[in-house]
Amino acid sequence: MDERALVFSDGLTDPQISQVLALAEAATRHDGVAPLSEQALLTLRAGRSRSLLSLEDGVIAGYAHLDPAPDGAGASGEVVVHPGRRRRGHGRALLRALRERARGPLRVWAHGDLAPAAALAAAEGMARVRVLLQMRRPLQDSPLPEVTVPDGVTIRTFEPGRDETAWLRVNGRAFADHPEQGAWTLEDLRARQAEPWFDPAGLFLAERDGRLIGFHWTKVHPDPIGEVYVVGVDPSAQGLGLGRVLTLIGLHHLRDRGLPAVMLYVDESNRPALRLYESLGFTRYAVDVMYQSPPPH
């Protein structure tokens, strides 16, 4: 008879981190979609993840990441089970353990909107509350509109050591209602700057009268494919069409690097952003879903 155990940790050991990363890679190969977000992977690799492990005969069969989310929106989590150890109750056990530790409403991301995840969420009484779309467009075989920068606005690239504070200010204002992006700290920003993909030449800043009012941060994946990583416009600069301008500047940059295509993520409920991206030739490619449970009784 196999031995099962659930283990909670505020920081996994290096061997445990390696096992979880291998588990996530196996799930990606099997499902065709990565089971963990960038933020979850960053905290995992840094040894700072609040983690739940589901063990079977001493082997990590499943992993859950818990983000206590001090923004008041409730805790959030992500769950992955090794493909070879599914349908044995690991996912359900991890989900219920997350709910207990959340001590309030729990939000859980299901990357890829896969049927087994939807079935588990329904069985656990969780409601579908948010849909994140991945959209894509080709770059080399599809023309891009030219860029016209508004009068009084200048564009330059990010300078590490100079622009962090201003960037965080605009990011916080632009995403004040966004539970993940708007709460970024200097530590979060520096964690991305330390990643091998970070390139300040791909982070474009818009300024007016010497003050930052918007940005477009691009990213290049090894596939290779480019990404509209994040576009933010300060509320004081709304109405200038700056979101479209910054998006196009980044798309031209990625095209000129020779990348065949570009991707982005956008909330399905963000109708203005969806209209913008569709007008620029993006189409829907994949879906992530957030489920929410009520607090435990």
Swiss-Prot record:
Positions that bind 1D-myo-inositol 2-(L-cysteinylamino)-2-deoxy-alpha-D-glucopyranoside: 38, 180, 219, 227, 265
Cited Pfam families: Acetyltransf_1
Record-stated family: Belongs to the acetyltransferase family. MshD subfamily.
EC primary class: transferase
Residues bound to acetyl-CoA 1: 79-81
InterPro entries: Acyl_CoA_acyltransferase, Bact_Acetyltransf, GNAT_dom, Mycothiol_AcTrfase
Key words of the record: Acyltransferase, Repeat, Transferase
Lineage of the species this protein comes from: Bacteria, Bacillati, Actinomycetota, Actinomycetes, Streptosporangiales
E.C. code: 2.3.1.189
GO molecular function: mycothiol synthase activity
Catalysed reactions listed for this entry: 1D-myo-inositol 2-(L-cysteinylamino)-2-deoxy-alpha-D-glucopyranoside + acetyl-CoA = mycothiol + CoA + H(+)
Binding residues for acetyl-CoA 2: 231-233, 238-244, 270-275
A biological process term (GO) from this entry: mycothiol biosynthetic process
Subunit structure and binding partners: Monomer.
Domain of life: Bacteria
Known function: Catalyzes the transfer of acetyl from acetyl-CoA to desacetylmycothiol (Cys-GlcN-Ins) to form mycothiol.
Residues covered by the N-acetyltransferase domain: 7-156, 153-297
NCBIfam families: mycothiol_MshD
Protein's recorded name: Mycothiol acetyltransferase
